[in-house]
């Protein structure tokens, strides 16, 4: 089980296939997604990675968190998240996960906070049908109707679908296909819509309901100390020693 990443939703656009068909995609951008800490079975009871993105102002970071960032030798991060991983998928602390951590064609699950829409009625919030347009109905065409009956049950049950605040909920959309990646600009293009507003934080991880492709990088694709991850780069051959003329 590999780590996920935190990305920022840029917006939607479309890309064209070789057959000329257009595919609507959501553009997600990774902004220096670095591993901040490890969670181990011995110390924490589970195995996970804590990753962070964005650059936070030092004045907005608590003294305790400054110390943790200093130990990891990374700049203070604006957004943090934990991802459960297997022990063989731990990425070194301080490494930066890149966009080619995911490959085109694989499926991912994305998690975000939905757009807030304020107070909404039953028809918009729960897709109620409303009352009739005529035949004795006046004023209350979009009302939800009776909620509690008379003597039986004589009350409105808890969790009854009623008008109220709509949006600003944590939602996960599963099985979105990765159409394209751009490691140089840190972009991931996924097919379809992603919950949340443009500029919102999105968590992207491998799909839990789809089989992971055999050619995905393990434990992941990352840069360590300004270079690509050791697990993904072959050692460069040594240059032959030059002989000096006597």
Curated annotation (Swiss-Prot):
A GO CC term attached to the entry: cytosolic large ribosomal subunit
Keyword Metal-binding: no
Region (Disordered): 140-162, 215-246
InterPro entries: Ribosomal_uL3 (IPR000597), Ribosomal_uL3_bac/org-type (IPR019927), Ribosomal_uL3_CS (IPR019926), Transl_B-barrel_sf (IPR009000)
GO molecular function: rRNA binding; structural constituent of ribosome
Keyword Ligase attributed: no
A GO biological-process term: translation
UniProt keyword annotations, A-Z: Methylation, Ribonucleoprotein, Ribosomal protein, RNA-binding, rRNA-binding
Domain of life of the source: Bacteria
Modifications after synthesis and translation: Methylated by PrmB.
Ranges of Low complexity composition bias in the record: 234-246
Modified residues (N5-methylglutamine): 151
Function of the molecule: One of the primary rRNA binding proteins, it binds directly near the 3'-end of the 23S rRNA, where it nucleates assembly of the 50S subunit.
Family indicated by similarity: Belongs to the universal ribosomal protein uL3 family.
UniProt xrefs under HAMAP family: Ribosomal_uL3_B
Assembly behavior: Part of the 50S ribosomal subunit. Forms a cluster with proteins L14 and L19.
Family matches, as NCBIfam families: L3_bact
The protein's name: Large ribosomal subunit protein uL3
